Design a protein with these regions (language model features):
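Secretory targeting and sorting signals
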Residues: 1-30
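Beta-rich ligand-binding surfaces for carbohydrates and other polyanions
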Residues: 31-151
Length: 151
């Protein structure tokens, strides 16, 4: 029992020493990683999906993720991470997607140039979401417009 306690205390002391050690120059100069943001089940007008941000369907069966490579992709994790749909905008790191106030859902480069658009300006509805109904399971909707039908 005493040996176990001494071993644990030694491990804790080593961890504390490691945490107190200053970072190397290379690590200190590296840009901090931006944590992914979960946007719930819907994206509302004015919302932005930054690199690695995502939303999921109401039942959690589908995920729409803005990848760090610039590609906006809908996945079905339960089917082996099957790709249901993609904007095919990879190769543009730092890109983001926004559901604009005019109803258009657009992927922009980090410099603000459009790469892909849903072409739903003036369309009805107020959210981007993924359906889980039996009729159109996995369909991605921008407002009332289906961007792709079922997965």
């Amino acid at each position: 029992m005493r040996k176990t306690l001494i071993t644990r205390m030694t491990a804790i002391a080593a961890l504390c020493a490691l945490l107190m050690t200053p970072l190397t120059t290379a690590t200190a100069n590296a840009a901090p990683a931006r944590p992914a943001t979960y946007h719930g089940h819907s994206l509302f007008r004015g919302d932005v999906l930054g690199p690695d941000d995502y939303l999921d369907s109401a039942g959690g069966n589908f995920i729409l993720r803005m990848q760090t490579d610039g590609n906006l992709v809908e996945y079905w994790p339960g089917a082996g991470w099957k790709v249901c749909w993609a904007s095919n905008t990879n190769g543009w790191p730092g890109s983001y997607a926004t559901y604009q106030g005019d109803g258009n859902f657009v992927v922009y480069t980090s410099g603000g140039e459009p790469l892909w658009a849903s072409n739903t300006v003036g369309g009805g509805g107020s959210t981007v979401d993924i359906s889980e109904s039996l009729r159109d399971y996995g369909s991605l909707y921008v407002g009332f417009t289906s961007i792709h039908y079922a997965c």
